[in-house]
Amino acid sequence: MDTAVEANLGAAGHGPRTELSDEDYYPQGSWDTVFLVALLLLGLPANGLMAWLAGSQARHGAGTRLALLLLSLALSDFLFLAAATFQILEIQHGGHWPLGTAACRFYYFLWGVSYSSGLFLLTALSLDRCLLALCPRWYPGHRPARLPLWVCAGVWVLATLFSVPWLVFPEAAVWWYDLVICLDFWDTEELPLRMLEILGGFLPFLLLLVCHVLTQATACRTCCGHQPRRMACHGFARVAKTILSAYVVLRLPYQLAQLLYLAFLWDVYPGYLLWEALVYSDYLILLNSCLSPFLCLAASADLRALLRTVLSSFAAAVCEERPGSFIPAEPQTLPGPTSEGQSRLDSVVQPQVNPSVQLQSDSVVQPEVSPSAQPQSDSVAQPTVGSLIQPPLDTVVQLEVNPLTQPQLDPMAQPQVNPSAQPQSKSVVQPQVDPLTQPQLDPVAQPQSNTETPIPAFGDESASNPGEENSSGPCPDPTPGTPENLDRPAVPQEKSPSNVPPEEAPSAGPT
């Protein structure tokens, strides 16, 4: 917090100076500004996101203990990084403070509240984990359920009270000619208030360090002894361990520099190296505040899952604002329900679209069913009867019984098909009829399809007009004979002449 110029006023009764010594040169330069700006750009959004995630998790009652800890810690780090903006402004002006005394007091108060709240919070966390590790049976039963809430509230109240002196004593004073600096303490109150600041920060840090070492030693002894872990919340313990370890490593240099400064404050004027130690150890605290949310995300699986959920919902909301990204998906869903209806219509309309093509296709397929009963001279008339009485479902099944005969169709009849109907039957009906009609070739399922009245009735009505022109009288339904020919292809070929001649009489009808 203290710069090289701010750290030494009042140590030996010094007032504003007319000349600068070697110890008064400002140690911070342009690279300090770059480093601090990078920390702010990275740490402020990260801590804000962490506070929002922890707050939403605590609001829904999921992991309240961990959520309250992370919320308080994120707010403390956010405020500490926000206070660094005043430090960047001071560096840019070469140590000159252009904002006046009120802003100077607000800067030190904000720094004191954020620093003290984080220190007190992690000290309470370390003490809680130490008691849980040393007294695993007694402490969980005697710990109140609302203890995390009470601790977080008490930490912020205590940090505010501890920072009250920074609302009273700091002021913007002239240091050399027109150079104005922001001083935290001055003259007679320097020694007692500096001791309160240093000891008030060092003693909680010492308690944190001792409790953390005891907790880790107990955990190592438990792991080495192959004893079952008694800590119920492994995710919370992992997050607490990560945060406390980083805090001890990155904030220990600042505490040591403060102790050295207190030792020199008694009778010796602090040197240039000690001033630099105070400045750059303060940068380590800023680095810790910047890395804290990333360490929490790395140690907590629940926070990572919550962050993925938030990012996915945000991406979905962004995509909804751009409906053009979903345009390619619409044509894929529209043909789905219409393809089935189109196949059903084509299976019935196919004999009516172009009778000449249907007759030619049946003339090739029909002789394979009864080659001895039907001569080739009647190959034109016989399919007419089949197209009149045979249900539309049988017309499709009849073509699918012999898949090898499909390539034998007359190539000259293919162009005669109606161009509006034939592409639909080729592109839509042919792929979808196979999985639907192939199971109907079973000897049990085939009579059921022929005996159903609604389907033949619809087929007879659609083909009634061609039948009246090509046949001289009513003909019996030949459907009972068709399943037998399909089930037993060897035997019915000899008996088929006895069943077919009554229907071959009107063969001279269509030409």
From Swiss-Prot:
Domain of life: Eukaryota
Membrane topology: Multi-pass membrane protein
Disulfide bridge partners, by residue number: 104-182
GO molecular function: G protein-coupled receptor activity; identical protein binding
Signal peptide residue numbers: none
Family to which the UniProt record says this protein belongs: Belongs to the G-protein coupled receptor 1 family.
Entry protein name: Probable G-protein coupled receptor 152
Encoding gene (name): Gpr152
